[in-house]
Amino acid sequence: MRKVLFCIAICFLVISLSTIIRAETLLYDDFCGNSVSSSKWHIPTWVSPTDGTVVGLTQFRFTQSSALPAADNGNAIIVVESYNPTAFSFYGTDLRSNQSFALGTGIHITVRAKMNTTTPGIVGGIFLYALKPGSTTYHDEIDFELLTNLPNGVQTNIYSNEKLGTGNVQFVPYPSGSISDYHTYEIKWHPNRVSWFIDGHLVRTETVHVPTGPMTFHLNIWVPDPGWPAAHDPNLKPATSASSNQIFSMSVDSVHIQSIAPPTEASGVAPIPPLQLLDKTP
């Protein structure tokens, strides 16, 4: 009897420990409903000087004049329009998580998305981002960028307390398909490395420029200026009237952000030693 009780106690301990070290879901959204939920997401505030409401040739929608993006058929529809009712520029979207994600033992991001346009000169972004405290240029960032100019691959980039600019770019081809197809994009952000995956295939690992501060998650779409020649197209210009407006979009099927469980023996940290079950029967 004592042996049975001892075994039950050990099993309970093992189950409890496995629960403690299991990855935790921090944000999940499959975008069911008619619009993106304000309990999970927001767009920039125009009055904030650090909100980045203008990038390239694009002004992002902001809370004072726009609603959150629509959802359709289980997808968030992230749009950029050629007509901007408030200025002569493109009118884009920068959807941001309400949460900020601290590195801890690691963060794992999984996004299923596709671009709905092949018109050259448009960029769709899937990324983590944060300006450094007190700065408007130094920042941390880990990203996937989908360029309609280069539809058969995706640009990856990373910054660690670096100025806005070129960063540390690596362009990777898709294992199959193009930006017009749904793909699963993953970022695994560890304390000592960052890995990018597409459709389960490892496409890049970075061990040098690894950010450590908390970051917010973004989904955006915008039109760059000539300062980014690989992504810019001089033939794509803002519309001068609502009647000539064009709408371009990225569909996001789901977002899943979770913590990464602490390392195990495979990464050099020894697990709890196995327990010897002794027969305690008198």
Where on the chain are the PLM-derived regions?
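Positively charged n-region of N-terminal signal peptides that target proteins for export
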Residues: M1-V4
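GH16 jelly-roll
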Residues: E24-T281
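Sec/Tat signal peptide C-region and signal peptidase I cleavage site
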Residues: L17-A23
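General helical structural elements
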Residues: F6-C7, N116
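Bacterial N-terminal signal peptides
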Residues: C7-S16
